[in-house]
Curated annotation (Swiss-Prot):
Reactions mediated catalytically: 5-(methylsulfanyl)-alpha-D-ribose 1-phosphate = 5-(methylsulfanyl)-D-ribulose 1-phosphate
Catalytic-site annotation from UniProt: D223
Protein name according to UniProt: Putative methylthioribose-1-phosphate isomerase
Known EC number: 5.3.1.23
Binding, substrate: R50, G51, A52, R84, Q182, N233, K234
Gene3D superfamilies: translation initiation factor eif-2b, domain 1, Translation initiation factor eif-2b, domain 2
């Protein structure tokens, strides 16, 4: 596992969920203790924990806490489900736990299974995807699709990690990823923590580096992937994909099967809009004039024709319906 960086810990003795408080990184490594499902809901909504797989695992433990504390399971399910609207892993994990509950099984046992499976899944994604990385590559990534966004290893960063573990000399460029700066604060923290060479750039530097020929590949994660290969991911992903297409740079998406949504159409997907204060303020200091509003979309949509391939725990596929559906047979 990625040294001792464990973003999600279940304490069986105290019946508590322990999360790395990602709001405090990179300056402080602190933990947020969840004793109730309400604590978990707050942690997801306020981005104590973030990243589609990590949200799913945390929500599963949240429903387990509701069962342990004798709370109304269906109420807890609704509260947790409504924390964030775009990442499909949240709904997948909650539905799986609710099904277990209806079948008379332990929600906690199901949550533990989801947690363990996520670790193994992310490991497989890395082992499969690293074959796409060549010695000497410079890889651009966006937001944080690492261990902090999952239970371990990550998705996009798992590919990078395993290339590094296998002795490939690589370099990583991390977009800062405004407004929450997950690239600068989290991706750079993770990679530096493991000794993987990384540099941070402002979001608007990416195109210039591509123009200069300094980017060999782009790897990002995903919050939801539709059956036709449409990818919903952190805002700014679409812009990178357009630039990559123009500059003929391979653009890969790394995600587990739990991130695929085979039922929904584009019209069904809600793009989360967060508080405009996240854009208007940096570290508590207002940078936008009073009286001026801000857009703060958390995610965007990347069409499949801009994506080279999708890396999953079952293999690498082209972003089209036929190949994606084969993954689920």
């Amino acid at each position: 596992m990625t040294k001792d960086l464990r973003p999600i810990i279940w304490d069986d003795d105290k019946k508590e969920l322990i999360l790395i408080d990602q709001r405090k990184l990179p300056n402080k490594l602190e933990y947020f203790i969840c004793k109730t499902y309400e604590d978990v809901a707050y942690a997801i909504k306020d981005m104590v924990v973030r990243g589609a797989p990590a949200i799913g695992v945390s929500a599963a433990y949240g429903l387990a806490l509701a069962e342990i504390n004798g709370d109304d399971i269906y109420k807890a399910y609704e509260v947790l489900k409504n924390t964030r609207p775009t990442a499909v892993n949240l709904f997948w994990a909650l539905d799986r736990c609710l099904t277990a509950y209806k079948e008379g099984k332990s929600i906690l046992d199901e949550a533990k299974k989801i947690h363990e499976e996520d670790i193994e899944t992310c490991k497989k994604i890395g082992m499969i995807g690293e074959k796409l990385i060549e010695d000497g590559d410079t890889i651009l990534t966006h937001c944080n699709a690492g261990a902090l966004a999952t239970s371990a290893y990550g998705t996009a960063l798992s590919v990078i990690r395993f290339a590094f573990y296998n002795g490939k000399k690589i370099r990583v460029i991390a977009d800062e990823t405004r407004p929450r700066l997950q690239g600068a604060k989290l991706t750079a923290f993770e990679l530096n923590y493991e000794g993987i060479p990384v540099k941070v750039i402002t979001d608007n530097t990416a195109g210039f580096l591509m123009q200069k020929g300094e980017i060999d590949k782009i790897i990002v994660g995903a919050d939801r992937i539709l059956a036709d290969g449409t990818v919903y991911n952190k805002i700014g992903t679409y812009s990178l994909a357009v630039l990559a297409k123009y500059h003929r740079i391979p653009f890969y998406v790394a995600a587990p099967l739990s991130t695929f949504d085979l039922r929904s159409s584009e019209e069904d997907v809600i793009i989360e809009e967060r508080d405009e204060k996240e854009v208007a303020y940096i570290d508590g200091v207002r940078i936008v004039p009073e009286g001026v509003g801000c857009y703060n979309y958390a995610f965007d949509k990347t069409p499949p024709d801009l994506i080279t391939a999708i890396i999953t725990e079952k293999g690498i596929v082209k972003p089209n319906r036929d190949e994606i559906l084969k993954l689920f047979r």
